[in-house]
Regions:
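Glycine-rich phosphate/diphosphate-binding loop of Rossmann-like nucleotide-binding domains
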Residues: 193-196, 201-311
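General beta-strand structural signal in soluble alpha/beta enzymes
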Residues: 160-164, 187-192, 235, 258-261, ...
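Glycine/serine-rich phosphate-binding loop and adjoining beta1-alpha1 elements at the start
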Residues: 96, 115-229
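Structured beta-strand/loop patches that form or line metal/cofactor-binding pockets in enzymes
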Residues: 42-73
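Phosphate-interaction motifs
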Residues: 61-122, 126, 130
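Rossmann-like adenosine-cofactor binding region
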Residues: 264-365, 370
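Adenosine-phosphate binding glycine-rich loop
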Residues: 2-25, 220-221, 335-446
Length: 446
């Protein structure tokens, strides 16, 4: 078995050299899915996984725009259309200087499995640019988004490819992108998700990823007749996912001790309550300031510069910042301090070594493709509402989100249950693979 896995990874690596993030994602899937493929005659010999790791389409383009000093700037734009076996391509756009082909291919590959897990008819894709919205004026961001969409619009559509937000792409950017698409196509359609509620968006969409990861963690705890009430939680990040994960943790009776950004983390031993969270939301979403400002208002809290929160004693850890933020040493620190549950809010925030340590010690660990699928799930519900030309209430959408996260958890249990442990990595990978693979087999070699 080891030889088959090694041979497969060698072949994929040969085709995708110098793409470490993508290979990391493929390796994690291959190690759990290939043994399953070999055990099933229907999949063995069909090269399905090899077909799944190859994008159906890779789009790369120049994005030229004019800054406030009337100087011409040039960035790169991308869209990876990974797999459309179960539905149109669906996945976010990321605007960040680190964006490259490897990162977007890893995100698109993960998205295929994540979208399959939601049970909604969505394929997988991802896109973005190395443009950095930080420090840019609203007008500069608008000009960039308009230039970006002027090329992207020809590749997307409500039944073809439906982008959404990601790091660096929030409500403001989605608005500018949608406005330009509407101008170019002269039509109002559900081509993007994450829209404002007054112009085709869904209630609960901004909260969905954060809420969803907490719902999933609660499902994990329920396996052992436990719950979130009274638990201490360390959360990284302070963007959309971290904010709403914090909000839902508070709703369910947990105590959130930390939040962070690229400058460091805050530790509030009294817990971040609703009032403090509102201040953080204003600080990050409106003023766009650093998390360190928090300790100026709440002097009992501590700010630790250039560090992450994984040395803090907690029951539950929810990494919500970015890929590979939690490494082996961080994982050791969490285990030493009594952490029993880790649920990924970001995409692949734990390194392979960290994940292996969690699995070896049999703590409850949820990979992002399962635990943070709430965002794309509600994106799918937004697409459904756009098709119906109808808006569901907050309660209806939240109820559907809870149900989807519960169904994802059940799928992980079905395929990931071992003798005395649930391997959620194995469960999520196999469950996602089976849905996509069955569709690919039915559609022939295309």
């Amino acid at each position: 078995m080891e030889k088959i896995i090694k041979q497969f990874l060698s072949e994929v690596n040969q085709r995708n050299q110098n793409e470490p993030e993508f290979m990391q994602a493929v390796t994690e899937v291959a190690e759990t899915v290939i043994p399953y493929i070999v055990s099933k005659d229907i999949y063995y010999g069909q090269n399905i996984l090899l077909r799944m790791v190859e994008p159906e389409r890779v789009i790369s383009f120049r994005v030229a725009w004019i800054d406030d000093n009337e100087e011409i700037q040039v960035n790169r734009g991308y869209r990876i259309e990974m797999n459309s076996a179960i539905g149109p391509y669906k996945g976010g756009l990321r605007f960040h200087p680190s964006v490259n082909m490897s990162i977007l291919k890893f995100l698109a590959f993960e998205q295929v499995f994540k979208n399959a897990l939601t049970t909604l008819p969505m394929g997988g894709g991802k896109g973005g640019s190395d443009f950095d919205p930080k420090g840019k004026s609203d007008t500069e961001v608008m000009r960039f988004c308009q230039s970006f969409m002027t090329e992207l619009f020809r590749h997307i559509g409500p039944n073809k490819d439906i982008p959404a937000g990601d790091i660096g792409v929030g409500g403001r950017e989605i608005g500018y992108l949608f406005g330009q698409y509407k101008r170019l196509k002269n039509e109002f359609s559900g081509v993007l998700t994450g829209k404002g509620v007054s112009w085709g968006g869904s209630l609960i969409r901004p909260e969905a990823t954060g809420y969803g990861v907490v719902y999933f963690i609660d499902e994990m705890l329920n396996v052992n007749n436990d719950g979130l009430k009274g638990k201490s939680v360390a959360i990284s990040g302070s963007g959309n996912v971290a904010q709403y994960a914090t909000e839902k943790c508070l709703d369910m009776g947990a105590k959130v001790l930390t939040l962070s950004d690229s400058s460091g983390y805050i530790y509030d031993k009294d817990g971040i309550n609703k009032e403090k969270l509102q201040y953080i939301m204003e600080l990050k979403n409106v003023k766009r300031k650093r998390i360190s400002e928090y300790v100026k208002k709440y002097s009992k809290a501590e700010f630790h510069s250039d560090k992450n929160p994984w040395s803090v004693k907690c029951d539950i850890a929810i990494p919500c910042a970015t890929q590979n933020e939690l490494n082996l040493n961080d994982a050791k620190a969490l285990l030493k301090n009594g952490c029993k549950t880790v649920g990924e809010g970001a995409n692949m925030p734990c390194t392979a070594d960290a994940i292996n340590l969690f699995l070896k010690n049999k703590i409850q660990y949820a990979p992002g493709k399962a635990s943070n699928a709430g965002g794309v799930a509600v994106s799918g519900l937004e697409m459904a509402q756009n098709s119906l030309k109808y808006t569901w209430s907050r309660e209806v959408v939240d109820g559907k989100l809870k149900e989807i996260m519960s169904d994802i958890h059940s799928s992980c249990i079905k395929y990931g249950s071992e003798k005395d442990y649930v391997n959620y990595v194995k469960g999520a990978n196999i469950a996602g693979f089976v849905k996509v693979a069955d569709a690919m087999l039915a559609q022939g070699v295309v």
